[in-house]
Amino acid sequence: MLNKYMGLIISLFSLGACTQLMHQQKFSVKGDYPSFTYQGNDIYAGAMNLAWNELSQSIVKAPIRLDSADSQVQAQVYNYNHPVFTAKDIESNSYYIKSGRGQSIVDTINQEVKVKFPHKKLADLQLKLGKDDVLAYAYLAKAVQYQTPFAQTVMNFSGKKVKAMSATTAAMRANLALLDYHDNNDFVLRLRLKEPTEELYLIKGHDQASIKEIVSLIKTHGQEAALQNSDHFKVPFLSLLAKNTHPDLVGKRFLNQGFENNVIGVMIENIQFQMDEIGASVENDAVISMVSMSAPSAQQPKDLIFDRPYWLVMKMKNAVTPYLVIHVRNSQLMKLVSTAQ
């Protein structure tokens, strides 16, 4: 059963080193995860769910309503008002949530989050707020390690040579639990981690599936199987620094009673993710401001080679929703190998 995931879902692309990309909004489907798209790769991150919940519960005191006839906007509002990820899906020492009014709340957040997460890499908030402006903020961080480090290697992904990791010893293969296998282009793997409360999945295939369908797939997997000595495993390193500014929601007026003269001033989420032969880490923060409208199977050897689009899911063992899901579609998030190597 899917339990504790990373509050992030990403449909990845190719990248040589850590790349920050411009936002592209994904088509919103009512009832699905509120994801966005970076160069053809879909990302869901849990911090925005936490920030939206904080604004809704602590400030507005009701589900948020926005003034828009755009069905895509309303689908996003619905999805955020019916969150797939809440604070119950991650332990308290992995997140920080705060809301308040005026410039003092920005200063308080910047100070408090550094105390709780002294190794935070994402930038401090730089917002300037009026005394009546409202801010809701959420931050989460996770880092996991495989039980045994993998070997570094290179591989081809969609025609490009990228840095990768592979299992070359019995101890490395013991990191991998095969949950479902139809063929070399359709299978589900779980990576065994040092952290007993965390889970990380890799799913190859299901290119047209929604995030909701991928989460359901993991929940319904069968009995785990160990890899055989003749089986092969490779997956690319990943590196991501992304920002979503929600341009379709910024400027929309609130319809909630008492907030009709306010609009969304800023709605930003930042995601930093790394995956290599040692483990994986994610940082994710989200901020929403409310401002006045006057302001701005077979015994044959299996080749478990992730050389085509695949999914990655990270969660806590007993949570309902993942905190990280990545659909890797191309090599934009990978570390390209120079032709000289």
Predicted regions and their residues:
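Bacterial N-terminal signal peptides that target proteins for export
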Residues: 1-6
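Bacterial N-terminal signal peptides
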Residues: 7-16
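Hydrophobic-core positions in well-structured secondary-structure elements of globular domains
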Residues: 19-341
